[in-house]
Each structure stands twice: as structure tokens, then as C-alpha cells.
């Protein structure tokens, strides 16, 4: 299987998995044009589309792709049923695509119906988990997002985190504002800064590394607890997550 990223809009990535036969899976095609160009350039045969949630920058290209390739099966959560989804999937179910079984994981927070797809080592996590960050809470609560991230963080160490936006540099600037002396965060920030200076992608990331540099996955880390305790005493990791998310919203 080959993993490909297609840039779209200002900072979106549309992920495409293809096998040796050229069959492909498309994830969150917010715009059809760059996908159609990539399909033509690589001679891919689209088999399926995965949708993680209903926002336009993730679903906007579906109808045009289905019109061009009517055999495509479009998997998505209930909230995408009016966006072109033909196969609604929910937590605990599986989607069998390109000979691989993808587990569906409910991850409410960014939207109430947001889902992710996992088939080792690939995690397509939409706008739930970003490198160095997490999605804004447009519909869900901080508690829901905390539980969603906890699920994703429990996946195998070698999981490839394929998120939908190039937010890594700004996320790492925020992480440095919280833990300015953390060695892992500083090292990763320098690496990301170099990549972005060359206009190179920072994704996918390996989950084992992400747990070290993403403050939203470190709510039980003593260094982070000490920083938060300087401002307010919060006993529960969920409360510390909510504190971080609120800080990031104002950053």
C-alpha cells in the first residue's frame, strides 16, 4: 500500500491510499479538482471514499468524484448522509476496502458525529488529532474531545497519524508557550520549522513520537501539571485538557 497526500485549499491534505493494482481509497476530498488530477497522473482506479465529518472542506468534492466514478462507495458518519455518503458507518463497525479492514472509531468533539478510520498502521483522523494539537470544539465538549483523544492515543506505537490539516508549526508554537524548556518539544519545533521553510509536509507522524510532543496528549504529565498548577489547581486530566484547549483558542 502506498500513502499519498494531496494538498488542497490553504492547508488541507486529502489522503489517498493505493495498492499495486492502482485501486485507491480517498479520504476527506474537500475539493475534487486536485484529486482528479492525481487520479489521472497516477492512473488510479478509485474504489472508496472515507469521510470523517460533515464540514465542507472535507466533503466538498464528493459529488463530483461520484459523478465521475459512479462505482465508488462513500463511507461516512450519519452527519454526512446528505453530503454523498452511501454507506453510513458508526463506532465499532468496519469498512473493508482494498483488501484491508478499517475499524471505525467514534471521536466526537470537533463535531458530534466525527469518526476516524484505523487499519494498522494508518489512522485517518480528520480534525480530531493534529500533530502537536487537536481540533477546535465546534459542536462537542472538552470532555468528549478528551475521551476521543484518549482512544486514539491508545492505538499502537507505530500508528501513522494522517490528519487533515497542516497546522503543525502553529501547534508547536503553542506547545512551546506552555512548556518552553521541554527538550522533545524544542527538537520537534526546530524540525517542523525547517520543513515548513522548504514548504514540505510535516505529516504523517508516528503516534509514539506524537505522545511526547503533543501537550493535549500529556494531561497526566507532571511537567504540564506543574505549569497548570501555577495558575489554577485542576485535579482531573479532563479539566487540564479543557484548560489547554481554552488557552489554545486564545493563542
UniProtKB/Swiss-Prot annotation:
Monomer. Transmembrane segments: none annotated. Zn(2+) 1 binds at residues 53, 55, 110, 127. Zn(2+) 2 binds at residues 57-58, 127, 165. Its cofactor is Zn(2+). Coiled coil: none annotated. Pathway: Secondary metabolite metabolism; methylglyoxal degradation; (R)-lactate from methylglyoxal: step 2/2. One of its GO terms (molecular function) is hydroxyacylglutathione hydrolase activity. This is Hydroxyacylglutathione hydrolase. Keywords: Hydrolase, Metal-binding, Zinc. It catalyses: an S-(2-hydroxyacyl)glutathione + H2O = a 2-hydroxy carboxylate + glutathione + H(+). It is an enzyme of class 3 (hydrolase). NCBIfam families: GSH_gloB (TIGR03413), PRK10241.1 (NF007597). The gene is gloB. Pfam families: HAGH_C, Lactamase_B. Thiolesterase that catalyzes the hydrolysis of S-D-lactoyl-glutathione to form glutathione and D-lactic acid. One of its GO terms (biological process) is methylglyoxal catabolic process to D-lactate via S-lactoyl-glutathione. Signal peptide: none annotated. Belongs to the metallo-beta-lactamase superfamily. Glyoxalase II family. Its EC number is 3.1.2.6. Gene3D superfamilies: Ribonuclease Z/Hydroxyacylglutathione hydrolase-like. Binds 2 Zn(2+) ions per subunit.
Amino acid at each position: 500500500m502506498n500513502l499519498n497526500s494531496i494538498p488542497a485549499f490553504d492547508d488541507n491534505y486529502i489522503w489517498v491510499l493505493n495498492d499495486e493494482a492502482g485501486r485507491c481509497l480517498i479520504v476527506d476530498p474537500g475539493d475534487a479538482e486536485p484529486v482528479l488530477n492525481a487520479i489521472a497522473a497516477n492512473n488510479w482506479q478509485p474504489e472508496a471514499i472515507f469521510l470523517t465529518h460533515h464540514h465542507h472542506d472535507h466533503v466538498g468534492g464528493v459529488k463530483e468524484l461520484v459523478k465521475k466514478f459512479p462505482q465508488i462507495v462513500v463511507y461516512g458518519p450519519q452527519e454526512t448522509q446528505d453530503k454523498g455518503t452511501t454507506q453510513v458507518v458508526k463506532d465499532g463497525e468496519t469498512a473493508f476496502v482494498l483488501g484491508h479492514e478499517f475499524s471505525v472509531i467514534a471521536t466526537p468533539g470537533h463535531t458530534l458525529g466525527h469518526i476516524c478510520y484505523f487499519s494498522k498502521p494508518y489512522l485517518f483522523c480528520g480534525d480530531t488529532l493534529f500533530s502537536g494539537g487537536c481540533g477546535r470544539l465546534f459542536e462537542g465538549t472538552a470532555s468528549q474531545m478528551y475521551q476521543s483523544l484518549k482512544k486514539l492515543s491508545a492505538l499502537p506505537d507505530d500508528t501513522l497519524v494522517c490528519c487533515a490539516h497542516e497546522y503543525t508549526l502553529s501547534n508547536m508554537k503553542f506547545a512551546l508557550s506552555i512548556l518552553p524548556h521541554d527538550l522533545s518539544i524544542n527538537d520537534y519545533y526546530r524540525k517542523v520549522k525547517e520543513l515548513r521553510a522548504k514548504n514540505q509536509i510535516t505529516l504523517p507522524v508516528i503516534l509514539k513520537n506524537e505522545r511526547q510532543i503533543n501537550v493535549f496528549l500529556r494531561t497526566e504529565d507532571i511537567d504540564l501539571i506543574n505549569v497548570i498548577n501555577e495558575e489554577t489547581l485542576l485535579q482531573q486530566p479532563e479539566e487540564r485538557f479543557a484548560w489547554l484547549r481554552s488557552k489554545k483558542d486564545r493563542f
